[in-house]
Curated annotation (Swiss-Prot):
Function according to Swiss-Prot or TrEMBL: Specifically methylates the pseudouridine at position 1915 (m3Psi1915) in 23S rRNA.
Residues involved in S-adenosyl-L-methionine binding: L73, G104, L123, S124, S125, L126, T127, L128
Designated name of the protein: Ribosomal RNA large subunit methyltransferase H
CDD domains cross-referenced by the UniProt entry: RlmH-like
Class in the EC hierarchy, top level: transferase
Quaternary structure note: Homodimer.
The enzyme's E.C. designation: 2.1.1.177
Lineage top rank: taxon: Bacteria
Organism in which the protein naturally occurs: Neisseria gonorrhoeae (strain NCCP11945)
Places the protein is found: Cytoplasm
GO terms of molecular function: rRNA (pseudouridine-N3-)-methyltransferase activity
Length: 156
């Protein structure tokens, strides 16, 4: 199973990179995990939020693996349990889907990009910093994969 996370933003704190790398390493042969950073559009000097999101959308669309099942993280998305996320991964794996999760920029994502997604998901009702979202998403994806492989990492 191939899992790609596209995250708008660069230059995360070291603890974010280290935590993501730790969970990514734990996937082992159970899933191929990749995090790709998308350059954020600079705001100000004549570039407003709408223009910035449009520029980021273009970069995101170029980075989505061809034919991938697109999941965008959005505050209005569904918040699955860890077991439900594992069931989604199981279904995508059985269908041979490459799954691509998108974490938008500071201003979010365009409506057009959200409409292209086959699923909208949220990690929490709280507003979270982007670095924390990277870590939480990667950990939850690892947890879901570990559930599918009956690994003792997840406990009910």
């Amino acid at each position: 199973m191939n899992i790609t996370v596209l995250a708008v933003g660069t230059k995360m704190p070291r603890w974010v990179d280290e935590a993501v790398a730790e969970y990514a390493k734990r996937f082992g042969r159970d899933a191929a995990y990749a995090l790709k950073e998308i350059k954020p559009e600079k705001r100000g000097a004549g570039v407003n939020a709408v223009q910035g999101m449009a520029a980021e959308e273009k970069r995101i669309l170029e980075a989505i693996p061809q034919g991938a099942f697109l999941v965008v993280l959005d505050e209005r998305g569904k918040a699955p349990t860890s077991v439900e996320l594992a069931e989604h991964l199981k279904s995508w794996r059985q269908n041979g889907e490459h799954v691509c999760f998108v974490i938008g920029g500071a201003d979010g994502m365009t409506d057009r990009l959200k409409q292209q997604a086959r699923m909208m998901m949220r990690l929490s009702s709280l507003t979270l910093p982007h670095g924390m979202v990277r870590v939480l998403l990667t950990e939850q994806l690892y947890r879901a994969v570990s559930i599918l492989h009956n690994h003792p990492y997840h406990r009910e």
